[in-house]
Amino acid sequence: SDWASVVEGLRGRDLSVDYAVVFQLRLPRAATAFVVGGMLGLAGVLMQILLRNPLADPYVLGVSGGAAVAALLAILLGWHVAGISGAAAVGALASMFLVFVLSRGSGDWSTTRLLLTGVVLASGWGAVVSFILAVSPDAHVRGMLFWLMGDISETFPGWIRLGLLIVSLLVAFGFARSLNLLSLGEL
């Protein structure tokens, strides 16, 4: 195929394979990657502001590791995409809760203690991920590795996700002034 057929496909005049590849495969995947990247960026910046630490992110705090372990277990159980995503969300929330509980200790928690607890938990989750990959049947390992690297092969038009990103950004912009004050710390 040449560029002329791609342009015709973009104009909606072509119902060939080129059109199907662009509008049914490539465009939904690109849109999904854009939305997921936007959501991850928003989550990261909000974590950094709320915890008043530029090192805070889902990986350092162990949230991503908890999501990965839960998702890999869901893949092992043969769950489909929605179940895997749901398991990852539950794993992320459970890991975040565990970080907050463990970092509190006997008194109040500090951001330093929270980050150090997250680093320890992230290392533990990394070991669990390695163990799951090592003992998993060969038939599942490829799918697990692709999922861990950010697989978007099974995607569908993400209008709901795009709407969620837009609403989340609008809410964050609504709190922008307060978040800026919070990021300055104590004056």
Summary of predicted features, one role per range:
Residues 1-187:
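Alpha-helical transmembrane segments in inner-membrane proteins
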